[in-house]
């Protein structure tokens, strides 16, 4: 067995040097998420965003990589750690959505160039995606009327920032 902590196995450096270890854990995470459907909380947030009057701009900032907020229909979504079901090539621009990893080989190759695929998720020791951080920065600069912090330990500064900002307003 690989005999390393999960935080190391799911890190950028290990993915680059020993992708089979990282993919082993990614497959386990995907299996745990497989078949999951949005719950009532996901549905309420998505519906609130769609039906609020006057029209509200409800933003969801999630650390989850399960894609459930998107599946529920949330319109304004910042998936700060990515989505496990979006795969991208490590060499070219090829991307695809894969909802079930069971058909993937242990080290899935790109259909375009044959290089290794990876999910569009933030591994440990990797930078957050620029598009997500820019979207969050834009919302932080606009401020908030109301912030709900649901289901998070708020261990990362970028997760607690909206709460702190709303408290200061």
Where in this protein do the model-derived segments appear?
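Conserved catalytic core of sirtuin-type NAD+-dependent deacylases
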Residues: 1-169
């Amino acid at each position: 067995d690989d005999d390393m902590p999960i935080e190391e196995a799911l890190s950028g450096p290990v993915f680059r040097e020993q992708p089979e270890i990282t993919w082993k854990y990614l497959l386990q995470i995907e299996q745990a998420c497989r078949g999951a459907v949005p719950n009532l909380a996901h549905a309420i947030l998505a519906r609130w965003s769609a039906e609020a009057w006057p029209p509200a701009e409800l933003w969801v900032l999630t650390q989850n990589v399960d894609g459930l907020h998107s599946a529920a229909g949330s319109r304004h979504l910042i998936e700060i750690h990515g989505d496990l079901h979006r795969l991208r090539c490590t060499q070219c621009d090829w991307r695809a959505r894969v909802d079930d990893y069971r058909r993937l080989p242990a080290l899935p190759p790109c259909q375009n160039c044959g290089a290794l695929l990876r999910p569009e998720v933030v591994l440990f020791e990797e930078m957050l995606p620029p598009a997500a951080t820019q979207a969050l920065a834009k919302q932080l600069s606009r401020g908030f009327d109301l912030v709900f912090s649901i289901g998070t330990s708020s261990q990362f500064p970028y997760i607690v920032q909206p709460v702190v900002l709303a408290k200061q307003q």
